[in-house]
Structure formats: structure tokens, C-alpha cells
Amino acid sequence: MKVNCFTELEVYGKFQSAETKNAIIEKIDIDVIGHFGNVTMLDIPIRIGDCLYSNPFSSISSTLSCGVFIQALFNLLEIGDDNGVKISSLNKIPCRVIVSDNKTVAIGNFMKNKFIVFEDLLKTFNEKFNK
């Protein structure tokens, strides 16, 4: 699935009072919650300064959308090699996040002006898979 990437300026155009912050992805966890139909949840704790945000991606809540998001994140952050990568081995990954109204709205490559906007990713996902 083709995921749209945006520049920082383009993301600022989508959200009022947006602010970019340097951050660290502490780790990536996928949890299957044993109630409400065995919901799959993606948990990616992100540290911004002294604050740890435990689940800014709460709208990513199905097995397929978790996979699509992880693939988009790996492509964005240029994680991986020919042998694959164990998600459990990933930690302390530098990134940039854009926050608007105390909500993480986009994540970006630390070295490049490239961001994934969660709202756009979910819209693209729903158009492709929830017809």
C-alpha cells in the first residue's frame, strides 16, 4: 500500500498550533487484548524530553492496520535490511513528532523532512481495505 509522506510545512498546513519535537521511540509492542473480540493494539511509547507518551497511536487497532502502520514506519525511518528485523529488537529510535492540541498527529524521519500523518494513513487504509 502506498503511504503518502508530507513535509513539515505541509503538516503544519493541516493542523492549527502544530509544533515539531525531537523524540525517541522507546520500543514497539503489539498487544492482543483478550476482550471485545480480541482487539489487536499497537503500542509505541515515544519519549519527548522527560515525558513518555504511552500510546499516541490508539486509533491503530486492527491486525491489518497495525501491519500497514509498521511497514510505513519502517519505510519512513529506513529501518530494516535484507534479512528482516525483529520488532522486539527495535528500541531507542530517534524520530521527530508533530504535536497539535496535545495530540501526536504525525511522526517523521529524524534526518529528513518526511512525515506520516496518522489521519491520512487511516483514511488511505480505510479506502483500500474497508470498502
Regions of interest found by a model, annotated:
Residues 1-131:
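Short beta-rich binding modules
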